[in-house]
Amino acid sequence: MNLIPRVALFADTFHEINGAANFLRRLTSYAKDNGHPLLCIRSGCETRVSNDGSVRYLDLKRIRASIPLDGDFRYDPLLWRKRALVKRTLKEFGADVIHLTGLNDISQFGFVHAHFMKIPAVATWHTNTHEYAAER
């Protein structure tokens, strides 16, 4: 029995400059540095799968017409067209748990796949919404 769970991280933010993205980059670095298996599903410039040590990345390219939310942070209502790729990648990885990081398009993928694939999920929230909204 392997005591290290295989985690699929659905990262709504990753490349952007914000506290949540910084935390998620540090989390993936920790997994890589310690040889922990991690699948990180995130936005990217192109849709592709890549590996970096024990970390596998599934980058999903958003359409140009995706909805801007804040800075570089966007919502792609058509991202669902990639659901078969996400499901296949999750199955190949063999996730024990899904980690959701927000309410945006990529975490929505995670929530739906966790439900239908019967994979336990944990959700974290990295933004104090009231303070964040007050500053905008």
Task: Label each residue range with its predicted role.
Residues 7, 97, 114-132:
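Active-site proximal beta-strand in glycosyltransferases
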Residues 44, 81-82, 103-106:
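Short beta->alpha connector loops
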Residues 65-70, 124-136:
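Acceptor-binding helix/loop patch of EC 2.4 sugar-transfer enzymes
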Residues 86-107, 120-124:
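Short N-terminal targeting/anchoring amphipathic segment
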